[in-house]
Amino acid sequence: MRIMPGSRKTDGFMRILIIGGGQTGAHLAEKFCEDEHDVVVIDSEAERLAELNTHLDLMTVQGDGANPATLEEADVERADMVVAV
């Protein structure tokens, strides 16, 4: 994936929050990390997050992605994109 012209980020990179670290979320995280975006994944399963951390350069937050406290911990206000899968 590449950033299209007109993106609000001038450096071409985005902070992307992915809610859900399952198969689809992990695939998205991998692609966004390949493009050197700043990726944060929220998931309720610690083992799933640990697996992502061993293979990718990203931040993980364990918790419920629908919980405002979890979103705050993930610094959702700084996100350029939020993907819930």
Language-model segments: residues:
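Cytosolic regulatory regions of ion transport systems
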Residues: 1-85
